[in-house]
């Protein structure tokens, strides 16, 4: 059963998750046994939220290997782009600017010209590095591994990155593309769409625990596809990373159309903006949240990027930092970084523009590696001895649940956890369908040799642990 396949609101391409970021090795419902290397398999996560969150929970001695399967190369390309931005060293981009750029690329169909330049630069470097990996056994970066993809898949990645680097000179209006999706989804309700937006927010998202999503910001996204506006400026440039090709049947012939085929109802706020450990951000006044999902997304990502900077090291720095005490930078070092960003003389010492190199000039995050697997690889993993009993945690999105079967037990490590995204935030589903989906998920997990974890009270994810034989 796949809850997210053809429901028009959710779209057919998963650009972001339908649930908040989780530490997949350590949570209230399960803790993975510590060992030399921890292996996590992500099936259809759509974005790097779980990767970033899981890294924050690592100790200085942990080694983490994340294996990623997505259902299209366009989603893999975007995952690589978002990880590239996440791993930019502080001397290239401060954590504050990185947070803004990440969120803009992550959730906005239209971005600022400055942000487009960041995307083009990243695409150019990723294209060169993957081309290099095609002719060499060496990895272009210790954390990002595309070597397990087929040659034709890596060729496809290069094609996508070059399209981002040099987009069409006369592109179709993405605002019209977005509006066409909204019209198709709402049908006769289009002329009263503000009422439809309010209904989805108040009667669905707010009722399902997303009260921090602001009415005006949500309506702006539903109307225009622009989610995050941290800076004043013109958000008028197409975000190429959110555009993909879909083949339609026209009079018996396949017609490929490039457009936006992702979510138009649930919102990008779900990944980073609806949960926080900082209770100050959840304060209310007159029964309204003082802060918004955008504010929470900014704070959460800032903390995640500070953790990456503390665990990682610049390619020019041979000595890894001490991460045994805390993964967050000190306030003093953060101030120093901000001062260097605002000091004109400091900025003059930085290189202005360099042509892309084979080596990705990114943070080397100590003990962390992310490997991308082919979209059709899930059913083939049990056939390869290297994956047998390998994964400590297996995550599966709501849109990919239909691919799970009893072969899971062959690739799951002893005491492994299975985490499945539920359909709570697929707004086109009725309450009965959401409940039915949860029942189906439980059946699939049990048939695969897993049992529900104790003390579960989440309606966002179902967590299972491997049965003891």
Swiss-Prot record:
Q: Which residues form the signal peptide?
A: none
Q: Where in the cell is it found?
A: Cytoplasm; Dynein axonemal particle
Keyword line: Cilium biogenesis/degradation, Cytoplasm
Question: One GO CC term of this entry?
Answer: dynein axonemal particle
Q: What InterPro entries does this protein map onto?
A: DNAAF3 (IPR039304), DNAAF3_C (IPR028235), DUF4470 (IPR027974)
Tissue specificity field: Mainly expressed in cell types that express axonemal dyneins.
Q: Polar residues bias: where?
A: 320-331, 339-356
Q: What happens when the gene is disrupted?
A: Static olfactory placode cilia; reduced movement of debris in the olfactory placode. The morphology and number of cilia in the olfactory placode is unaffected, but an abnormal ultrastructure in these cilia is observed, including reduced or missing outer and inner dynein arms.
Give the GO biological process terms.
Answer: axonemal dynein complex assembly; cilium movement; motile cilium assembly
One Pfam family this sequence matches: DUF4471
Region annotated Disordered sits at 313-356
User: So what does this one do?
Assistant: Required for the assembly of axonemal inner and outer dynein arms. Involved in preassembly of dyneins into complexes before their transport into cilia.
Identify its protein family.
Answer: Belongs to the DNAAF3 family.
Task: Cite the PANTHER family for this sequence.
Answer: DYNEIN ASSEMBLY FACTOR 3, AXONEMAL, DYNEIN AXONEMAL ASSEMBLY FACTOR 3
The entry's protein name is: Dynein axonemal assembly factor 3
Task: Look up and give the organism this protein is from.
Answer: Danio rerio (Zebrafish)
């Amino acid at each position: 059963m796949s809850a997210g396949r053809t429901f028009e609101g959710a779209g057919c391409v998963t650009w972001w998750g339908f649930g908040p970021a989780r530490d997949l090795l350590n949570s209230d419902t399960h803790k993975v046994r510590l060992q030399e290397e921890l292996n996590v398999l992500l099936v259809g996560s759509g974005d790097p939220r779980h990767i970033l969150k899981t890294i924050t929970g690592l100790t200085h001695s942990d080694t983490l290997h994340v294996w990623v399967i997505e259902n299209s190369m366009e989603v893999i390309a975007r995952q690589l782009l978002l990880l590239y931005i996440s791993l930019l060293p502080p001397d290239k981009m401060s954590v504050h600017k990185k947070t803004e750029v990440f969120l803009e690329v992550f959730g906005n169909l239209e971005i600022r010209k400055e942000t487009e330049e960041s995307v083009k630069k990243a695409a150019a470097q990723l294209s060169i590095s993957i081309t290099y990996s095609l002719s060499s056994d060496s990895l272009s970066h210790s954390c990002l591994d595309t070597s397990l993809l087929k040659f034709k898949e890596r060729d496809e990645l290069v094609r996508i990155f070059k399209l981002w680097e040099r987009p069409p000179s006369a592109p179709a209006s993405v605002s019209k593309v977005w509006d066409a999706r909204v019209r198709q989804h709402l049908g006769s309700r289009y002329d009263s769409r503000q009422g439809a937006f309010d209904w989805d927010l108040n009667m669905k998202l707010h009722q399902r625990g997303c009260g921090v999503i602001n009415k005006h910001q949500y309506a702006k996204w539903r109307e225009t596809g622009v989610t995050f506006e941290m800076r004043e400026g013109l958000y008028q440039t197409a975000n190429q990373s959110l555009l993909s090709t879909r083949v339609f049947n026209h009079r018996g012939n396949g017609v490929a159309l490039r457009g936006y085929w992702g979510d138009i109802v649930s919102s990008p706020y779900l990944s980073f903006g609806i949960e926080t450990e900082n209770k100050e951000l959840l304060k209310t006044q007159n029964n309204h949240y003082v802060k918004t999902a955008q504010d929470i997304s900014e704070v959460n990502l800032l903390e995640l990027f500070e953790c990456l900077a503390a665990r990682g090291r610049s390619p020019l720095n041979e000595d890894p930092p001490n991460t045994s005490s805390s993964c967050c930078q000190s306030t003093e070092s953060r101030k120093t970084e901000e001062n260097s960003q605002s000091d004109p003389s400091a900025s003059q010492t930085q290189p202005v523009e360099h042509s892309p190199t084979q080596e990705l000039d990114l943070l080397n995050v100590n003990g962390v590696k992310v490997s991308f697997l082919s979209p059709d690889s899930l059913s083939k993993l049990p056939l390869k001895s290297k994956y047998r009993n390998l994964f400590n945690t297996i995550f599966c999105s709501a849109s990919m649940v239909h691919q799970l079967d009893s072969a899971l037990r062959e690739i799951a490590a002893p005491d492994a956890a299975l985490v499945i995204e539920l359909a709570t935030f697929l707004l086109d589903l009725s309450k009965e369908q959401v409940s039915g989906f949860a029942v189906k998920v439980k059946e699939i997990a049990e048939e695969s040799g897993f049992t529900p974890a104790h003390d579960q009270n989440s309606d966002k994810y179902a967590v299972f642990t491997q049965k003891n034989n």
